[in-house]
């Protein structure tokens, strides 16, 4: 994926085949039909696929580790495999370089640091992944069967438990993990899908992709689900919980604001790599920054989350992300969302704002440019924009989502600012228009008496009242100050 033609490789799936032909290029054969062979797809699979299981015994990325061999119990002992410990299998994805990427060594090191007694095994299927994408997709099923074979052999040792197995798959590797979980005799404890690949997996049968049936607990991070009409990561939910950081598309720090520049200078592949690989770094972050866990919140769609509607933790509606995710098994997939920083630690602090706006005059279809500053006992926020996902409803309560990169502590006051031309100049312009017998523009004045704030991380709710009840109006170029309401500091909203 370091190669500059990474994105072009995906685009070739769409530009080089007739419309609709991709449906015939999906992974062939049911997982439960062991003897079915793909037809109509060029597959470069040898009789004995090149898949190795390398147990990492050192944090040094230059250390080669020790290769396990199915059926060789003596080698298992010599490699220091602990039959009663947790066992992690890390499964990489498609590769254009034929080499491991730097993220793999970081993930190995983070797991070894967090779980010192655990077995960390790298599933090396580079010879089968270093192919045309459509061939690598076909090979995922074969690799999944090899992983299942290794797990079945380990189970024969008696002390080894599938419940202690955690398969971690990135991109195509996530679907390899799904195949392994489906083929194995018994149920794997957990599978984590790190931005599972989308092309040729989107919308297919559950037996041909990662699904909740593949392990006792399947959690998924989606970080690159949509870009220019092509989703490199899978959009659809495929686990018990599916987490979409920043909506699951453009990730902070990955060059979204300079997309055209990326095209111009040939660095689009780096932007793609950043977005797609962000899932891995979020997982690593959850291992190394235990004191700064990131929380995700259940929501039906990203727009509702952007509006700040979904910050409830009742009935398991919020969860940690990454390694610390709590097991949730429901009949339906739980889609969850959160905001993040551009780098480690990725944690931010979410706030829901409920603002009742009303007007004594006809304000028409008004879209104010509002900013808010939160003042806390630990720190003050920056001037935060209130994103208007849908139009402002007058004489009604409007909900917003804001987030900060640092912990503010207990909030004690709020400043609300309406950016733009001051009201005096606006009124002067209206009078001039009236003099010329032109219809007046709608009044640009809002009245706000109270703001209710809820912290997503602490679930605490506080009400803030305008400083002077008689001065609750705000127009462009003005600001309003709010302080904790004397009689209603803690609210139920």
Curated annotation (Swiss-Prot):
Belongs to the AB hydrolase superfamily. Lipase family. It is termed endothelial lipase due to the fact that it is synthesized in endothelial cells, a characteristic that distinguishes it from other members of the family. However, this protein is also expressed in other cell types. It is an enzyme of class 3 (hydrolase). One of its GO terms (cellular component) is cell surface. Heparin binds at residues 327-339. GO terms for biological process: cholesterol homeostasis; fatty acid biosynthetic process; high-density lipoprotein particle remodeling; phospholipid homeostasis; positive regulation of cholesterol transport; positive regulation of high-density lipoprotein particle clearance; regulation of lipoprotein metabolic process; response to nutrient. It comes from Rattus norvegicus (Rat). It holds the Pfam family Lipase. The active site is at residues 171, 195, 276. This is Endothelial lipase. InterPro entries: AB_hydrolase_fold, Lipase, Lipase_LIPH, Lipase_N, Lipo_Lipase, PLAT/LH2_dom, PLAT/LH2_dom_sf, TAG_lipase. PANTHER family: ENDOTHELIAL LIPASE, LIPASE. Its main location: secreted.
